[in-house]
From Swiss-Prot:
<dbReference type="GO" id="GO:0006412">
    <property type="term" value="P:translation"/>
</dbReference>
<keyword id="KW-0694">RNA-binding</keyword>
<comment type="subunit">
    <text>Part of the 30S ribosomal subunit. Interacts with proteins S7 and S18. Binds to IF-3. Interacts with VmlR. Interacts with BrxC.</text>
</comment>
<dbReference type="GO" id="GO:0019843">
    <property type="term" value="F:rRNA binding"/>
</dbReference>
<keyword id="KW-0687">Ribonucleoprotein</keyword>
<dbReference type="InterPro" id="IPR036967">
    <property type="entry name" value="Ribosomal_uS11_sf"/>
</dbReference>
<dbReference type="Pfam" id="PF00411">
    <property type="entry name" value="Ribosomal_S11"/>
</dbReference>
<comment type="function">
    <text>Located on the platform of the 30S subunit, it bridges several disparate RNA helices of the 16S rRNA. Forms part of the Shine-Dalgarno cleft in the 70S ribosome.</text>
</comment>
<dbReference type="InterPro" id="IPR019981">
    <property type="entry name" value="Ribosomal_uS11_bac-type"/>
</dbReference>
<dbReference type="InterPro" id="IPR001971">
    <property type="entry name" value="Ribosomal_uS11"/>
</dbReference>
<dbReference type="GO" id="GO:0003735">
    <property type="term" value="F:structural constituent of ribosome"/>
</dbReference>
<keyword id="KW-0689">Ribosomal protein</keyword>
<keyword id="KW-0699">rRNA-binding</keyword>
<dbReference type="GO" id="GO:0022627">
    <property type="term" value="C:cytosolic small ribosomal subunit"/>
</dbReference>
<comment type="similarity">
    <text>Belongs to the universal ribosomal protein uS11 family.</text>
</comment>
<dbReference type="InterPro" id="IPR018102">
    <property type="entry name" value="Ribosomal_uS11_CS"/>
</dbReference>
<protein>
    <recommendedName>
        <fullName>Small ribosomal subunit protein uS11</fullName>
    </recommendedName>
</protein>
């Protein structure tokens, strides 16, 4: 009774030839996540400050956001990406740094769009911090 065993090898990543895509930058007070997708929304590459080894308050710095954007850009350039639209979400400090890093990596930014959700007086916000 030999049970069918699942092989240990991972599926090799197929190189996609994509000319243009969308960079989704989510910049919160604690972290910055950069996901680069094709125009249909399928992820090509992603990176975040936490995934790069930044911990604690260093995750929320503009430098950490810059490094995350560079890493995501390198992964997407391998798939043939040349032009990007950028959507930025959130109030964090790494917004501008991440956009600049994408441009410095050799990607042409065609549009920058702010898609930060703004409530029309929805949920009650958390109470103010007193430090």
């Amino acid at each position: 009774m030999a049970a069918a065993r699942k092989s240990n090898t991972r599926k090799r990543r197929v190189k996609k030839n994509i000319e243009s895509g969308i960079a989704h930058i989510r910049s919160t007070f604690n972290n910055t996540i950069v996901t680069i997708t094709d125009t249909h929304g399928n992820a090509i590459s992603w990176s975040s400050a936490g995934a790069l080894g930044f911990r604690g308050s260093r995750k929320s710095t503009p430098f950490a956001a810059q490094m995350a954007a560079e890493t995501a850009a390198k992964g997407s350039i391998e798939h043939g990406l040349k032009t990007l639209e950028v959507t930025v979400k959130g109030p964090g400090s790494g917004r501008e740094a991440a956009i600049r890093a994408l441009q410095a990596a050799g990607l042409e930014v065609t549009a920058i769009r702010d898609v930060t959700p703004v409530p029309h007086n929805g949920c009650r916000p958390p109470k103010r911090r007193r430090v």
